[in-house]
A protein has these predicted regions:
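A structural signal for multi-pass alpha-helical bundles of membrane permease subunits
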Residues: 4-6, 29, 37-317
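Transmembrane alpha-helices
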Residues: 1-34
Length: 317
């Protein structure tokens, strides 16, 4: 389909949406009283439901159906899912994704929490927080390019422009190709995501810490509770809802990580993750069935985290 055709479809969809919305409002104006209020409420909800159905529900159902279509010879079955969970290269992708999902939320939250506690009520608190939060203002691709220069490797005969290798060379140590040598290269990519997300964790947790009533802190200190015990028995339980939100939010973002891997290694050298393989299957190998299976897997992994987050928020409300 050419560009004109795509734009025509887009404007047609917008026109249909506008007609439905106007028609619903006209219908609502014909009714009065409670019935009219209900119809009017439905008139405002209906367009949103239509958008969800067209933009979310229909593509989701279509993706699930496509995931059972076997690429190549055709047919329907579980072969795409079997490929994901049996082929060596795909098992490596799942392992890498698991490492990302476990390490990034936990380390980012721990670093953000530690930093929030250390700079709390310090003279340079605002400046110190701004330094850690700045990476959040950088796009994933921009952060990846920055860290790619940090990890840059050149043969010993050439001057090192990568920060880490320049330091190693200055210390008389052997330089390393950080993005090539596995499995450590996956951890070097994970560092980039932690660097970005630590600022988010610090901001949310710092606000939660400041929300703890001073009376509780003072009462605990009068009872002889201080230092780590104060953190364990007073601070941490008080900010638990914020910790849950931070961990789950970062976890969801980490499951969908794509930009960092794509920019820094392209998924090569055993660093690929589920989102990157979804892209490769669809756009590089033209395997719509396998790509859809990866997308469904990603959805299945994200849903439990979202549900858990909602349940915890309702409990703490």
């Amino acid at each position: 389909m050419d560009v004109v055709g795509k734009f025509s479809q887009m404007f047609l969809a917008l026109g249909v949406f506008a007609l439905v919305f106007v028609g619903a409002l006209i219908l609502a104006s014909l009714f009065k009283g409670r019935r009219g209020e209900k119809v009017q409420a439905g008139a405002f909800v209906l367009p949103a439901l239509l958008l969800l159905a067209v933009g979310l529900l229909y593509p989701a159902v279509l993706t699930i159906l496509k995931s059972f279509v076997i690429d190549g010879p055709g047919g329907v079955g579980l072969q795409n899912y079997l490929d994901i969970f049996t082929r060596t290269e795909n098992l490596l992708v799942l392992r890498n994704t698991a490492l990302w999902v476990v390490l990034v939320p936990l380390v980012s939250t721990a670093v953000g929490l530690l930093y929030a506690i250390l700079v709390d009520r310090a003279r340079i608190e605002a400046f110190a927080k701004a330094l850690v939060f700045l990476p959040m203002a950088i796009s994933m691709v921009g952060a990846s390019i920055i860290w790619k220069f940090v990890y840059e490797f050149r043969p010993n005969v050439r001057p090192q422009i990568g920060v880490l290798n320049a330091i190693l060379k200055a210390l008389g140590l052997d330089t390393q190709n950080f993005l090539l040598n596995g499995p450590a290269n996956t951890f070097f990519l994970i560092v980039v995501m932690i660097w970005i997300q630590a600022g988010f964790a610090m901001t949310v947790l710092s606000a939660a810490i400041k929300g703890i009533p001073d009376d509780i802190i003072e009462a605990a200190k009068l009872d002889g509770v201080g230092g780590f015990k104060l953190f364990r028995f007073v601070t941490l339980p008080s900010i638990r809802p914020a910790v849950v939100v931070v961990v789950t939010t970062i976890g969801i973002g980490t499951l969908k990580v794509f930009d960092i891997v794509r920019t820094m290694t392209g998924g090569q050298f055993d660093t690929s993750v589920v989102a990157n393989e979804f892209y490769n299957a669809i756009f590089r190998y033209n395997r719509d069935g396998l790509g859809s299976a990866f997308a469904v897997l990603l959805f299945v992994l994200v849903v439990p985290i979202v549900v858990y987050n909602i349940v915890q928020m309702r409990k703490d409300a």
